[in-house]
C-alpha cells in the first residue's frame, strides 16, 4: 500500500529535542526526499557564518527569538511566526539567541545532505560540530 501523505505535530516534535547539546543545533528529519527535505531543529548557541551549496532554505521560527545575519545585511531579530528565505550559497549566521528555546521548521529545496555545511572560517566548525540528528 502506498502512503499518499504524512502528518506531523510540529509543536510536539520540537519539544522532543534535547535541552542541551554539544553541537550548535539538533534536528529531527521529517522528510528526506530528493526534491526537498524538511526538519525541525533547535539552536543552542551562536552559529558562525556558513552556507549550503545544494539547496535554497526556508526557515519558519516556531519558538524563541534570535538575531540572524544574511549575506551582507545587518543583523535582524527574528521571532516566532516569521519565515526567512535565502538561496543556496548565501552566507548566513545566528550571532545571538535572544530567547530560548529557539526552534525552527526548515524546508530545504532540493534536499540538503547533512554534510552540506561550509563555514566561511573553516576553524569555526565542521558538519559534525554543526548538527546532530535525532530520530
For each feature predicted by the language model, list its residue ranges.
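A short beta-strand-loop-beta hairpin characteristic of the jelly-roll/cupin
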Residues: 58-80, 95, 117-119
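Short loop/turn positions at the edges of beta-strands in beta-sheet-rich folds
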Residues: 34, 53-55, 62, 72, ...
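A short, N-terminal "cap"/entry segment at the start of jelly-roll beta-barrel domains
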Residues: 1-41, 48-49, 120-135
